[in-house]
């Protein structure tokens, strides 16, 4: 996996953007980058950090699993992190350029389909915007003051 990490170029952009090939091992590596960023930025307990990282991992794992299914080459995924110190919120967005897969469109499998439920349980707000040209999953977490 080749991940690239960089601070955003403009103040209105994310504080951190990390991009990697959309594969399962990358989900863990990108989640670790988010954890390191959170530890430097926000003053919350380790349980809250773990919840945020787990939600991020789940969004990344879903992307690695579904975004480029059926395509010859594996695409990329990015995670964007933003800390709004005034609002005391953290917003994480996982972005891909694959094809949106409606979770209700496939056959029911009792061993799968818990990702969105888990993300909803862990974050304060979840938005999913999927199109034929990519998907953007954003998770917002409240009560995250600056260090």
Where are these regions (language model features)?
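A short beta-loop-alpha structural element at the N-terminal edge
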Residues: 20-26, 30
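Conserved short strand/loop->alpha-helix "switch" segment adjacent to the catalytic nucleotide/phosphoryl-transfer site
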Residues: 35-57
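Histidine-centered phosphotransfer motif of kinases
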Residues: 50-70
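Generic recognition of well-ordered alpha-helical segments
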Residues: 32, 36, 121-124
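Conserved beta-strand-loop-beta-strand hairpin that lines the nucleotide-binding pocket
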Residues: 1-21, 64-147
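Conserved catalytic/ATP-binding subdomain
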Residues: 25, 47-50, 75
């Amino acid at each position: 996996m080749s991940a690239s990490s960089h601070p955003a170029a403009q103040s209105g952009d994310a504080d951190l953007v990390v991009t990697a090939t959309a594969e399962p091992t990358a989900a863990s590596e990108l989640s670790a980058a988010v954890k390191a960023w959170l530890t430097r930025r926000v003053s919350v307990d380790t349980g809250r950090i773990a919840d945020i990282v787990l939600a991020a991992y789940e969004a990344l794992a879903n992307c690695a699993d579904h975004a480029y299914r059926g395509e010859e080459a594996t695409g990329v995924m990015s995670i964007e992190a933003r800390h709004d110190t005034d609002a005391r919120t953290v917003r994480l967005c996982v972005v891909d350029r694959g094809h949106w897969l409606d979770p209700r469109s496939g056959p029911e499998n009792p061993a799968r389909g818990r990702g969105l439920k888990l993300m909803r349980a862990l974050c304060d707000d979840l938005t999913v915007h999927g199109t034929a040209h990519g998907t953007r999953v954003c998770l917002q977490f409240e009560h995250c003051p600056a260090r």
